[in-house]
Amino acid sequence: MVKGTPLSGKSLLFALTRLDRNNPEKEWFRTSEIHEVYQTVARDVEVEPKGYNRALELLNKHVTTGVLESKKKERGDQGKFRSYSLQGDVESTRTGLINSTPELQTLMGW
């Protein structure tokens, strides 16, 4: 699923699984929401968080590999924004990330 993905890319996906778990009524999350949670995850695993634009590039890379789906919206005065949704089962993605990434295991107390 995410073999060869750098820790920053896995941390972004983990942030999205955290958002999904904490907001079961939502399916789509804006880049800014994901980036905010990602910054916390990155610091928790003691890695320097990537900036917003680099995080956006990494999210789009996950779209091209089929892990994420994205959609663009225009909101008039609020401008354009992109939202992302995990493809497949969120818990399976979360478990796969945790099992394959020792740094993320520390967040789970493993």
Swiss-Prot record:
GO terms for biological process: DNA replication. One of its GO terms (molecular function) is ATP binding. It holds the Pfam family Cdc6_C. InterPro entries: Cdc6_C, WH-like_DNA-bd_sf, WH_DNA-bd_sf. ATP binds at residues 8-12. CDD domains: Cdc6_C (cd08768). Disruption phenotype: Not essential for normal growth. Keywords: ATP-binding, DNA replication, Nucleotide-binding, Plasmid. Involved in regulation of DNA replication. Belongs to the CDC6/cdc18 family. This is ORC1-type DNA replication protein 3.
